[in-house]
Amino acid sequence: MFVLSTARCTETRANKPTNHRRAEPDLTTSPRLLSSLLFSSLLSPLSTPRTRPSYNANAPSPSRTPMITLQSITDAVGLGSARYGGFQWSVALGWIGLVWYSTVTTVCALGYYKLWKHCLRRPQSSYCATAQNAPHVTVIRPVKGLEPHLYDCLASSFRQEYPRGKLTVCLCVSSRSDPAYATLEKLVADFPHVDARIYVEEEDPLLQPDHKPMYNLGPNPKIRNMSRAYREAKGDIVWIADCNVWVGKGVCGRMVDKLCGLGSGSSTEYKFVHHLPVAVDVTGVIGVDERRALETSGAARVKDGKSACAPGVLAMGGGRLEELFLSSSHAKMYTAINTVLIAPCIVGKSNMFRRSHLDYLTTTASCQFNPGIDYFSDNICEDHLIGDLLWKNRVREEKEDGKHLGKHALVFGDLAFQPIANMSVQSYIARRVRWLRVRKFIVMLATLVEPGTESILCSLYGAWGVTTVLAEYFQNKILSTWTTFFTFFGFSILTWCLIDWTVYIMLHSGKTVERDENTPSFARPPQGTTRRRFSHWLAAWLGREILAFPIWFWAIWGGMTVTWRDRQFRIGLDTKAHEIGGNSRAGLLEEQASGRENENEATSLITTAVKRQTRGNR
């Protein structure tokens, strides 16, 4: 790794002192020197030394009195010392690392401030909750199999404080053989005053084999479930929320207020509004009947990989990792980016927009699909693409009427709670890999730099910057030591950890939730000071931070296939999803055939669990 030059050898006189030799550098105490020598070994073949070594035939043999000296990169490639106007790679990289560290910590600080400002108090009541002229809202809930607390999550849409007659709930499922179908029927029966309907993909007229011309919808199973509900939606405003999301009873009104610029807040209208997702691991909390139903239906199995074969940390620890990820690093970055609004940042758990806007932007002569969400049926990451399309393009009101519309808005204070149970570590990894592989062709730059926003790598960048840039600027040898490097790194990790702990406490405090007798346990304030003990939380935090880079590396360089909703897809460079193993219709028929064996038993268990859970809530 070092550039060696043999100096001209001279005989040492016996009467001359020999204690004036040049001291060799200590590589163990200087990160900057080690980096210089490292780059020297890499770049020296590409450059010409300043002087060529000369050999004197009359000189004594080198074996008699050799003197070996080390040259840094600046001497080797002729760039000179930075102190004298030259250039050093270590300092250049140090500047990059220091600027990056400062930028990331500033963004995290902004996100932390916004969470502290909005997540420790209950949001105000919405204007639309009592307004007779409130716009009509169509709620679309795509359902796939059983999820923990499925009844509670879906029922939260029926319990919204919104003018009666101005809210329609659409429950979408692929087939009547889906284990969740009994739950959907019970919901419709339990809320007869709500305009609600169950949409079955198998019964969609456009998707029937005898339909002329045949409507060749893309392979995205979520879009296929929602397609008919979207086409037949009442009114202009559409609210799409995943089936495993629970929201408070005043959320719909506040979303409409933000979208339409109503109420006491800002009068700016937006094209797209959404919520911050928060996961809660409810493993061990759900009832026995519900757990048996989940296991029978297969929802407790790992959805994105092989099933966990034994209970324990690996079999059940994925839920804690997911809970921690959405309640720490993700929450800070998501909130900060949606505060400065430099780019679209969306997670498709709970989104609201206007049909007229999306239809206008997706009506093209070359598209083979209907306008609206069907336009994205060839893609997996449809939620991000919908938001991205509304962000980058002007709608009719902006073009023709000159109306000013905001791009996106996060409804601060309201959270989209997602209960999860029996998630293995392998399932968590597969989930993160799937998300990264889908995103890497959609937002490539953001995906490539994502590891640098995590605590470990970002702290390494900062430590490198301090021990190179600041050491060079202040001419302080102490700052350039490995002791300073690891001291800064350790202090940064400790500070990062404590900040994430307080973020977790704020998000799980339950102070933003409008509680009543129907509020489930996972959305209520914890019985103790915090939802998890610090030691348990710290173990999950360390596990997630350590896994962050390996997961990213495998997702980016380990392939282009993902598994979603029990189907395998290959993500192309055009960001489209290509189903592996046949077309979507064949995959659907195969899925239906494999699920009919346990249909009767699962339906019976589900019905029993739902009835007991409903009686318990009441």
UniProtKB/Swiss-Prot annotation:
A motif (D3) lies at residue 383. One of its GO terms (molecular function) is ceramide glucosyltransferase activity. The keyword Calcium does not apply. Glycans are attached at residues 225, 422. It catalyses: an N-acylsphing-4-enine + UDP-alpha-D-glucose = a beta-D-glucosyl-(1<->1')-N-acylsphing-4-enine + UDP + H(+). Keywords: Glycoprotein, Glycosyltransferase, Golgi apparatus, Membrane, Transferase, Transmembrane, Transmembrane helix, Virulence. Signal peptide: none annotated. It comes from the Eukaryota. It is found in: Golgi apparatus membrane. It is a multi-pass membrane protein. Its EC number is 2.4.1.80. The active site is at 383 (proton acceptor). Belongs to the glycosyltransferase 2 family. This is Ceramide glucosyltransferase. It comes from Emericella nidulans (strain FGSC A4 / ATCC 38163 / CBS 112.46 / NRRL 194 / M139) (Aspergillus nidulans). The lineage of its organism: Eukaryota, Fungi, Dikarya, Ascomycota, Pezizomycotina. The gene is gcsA.
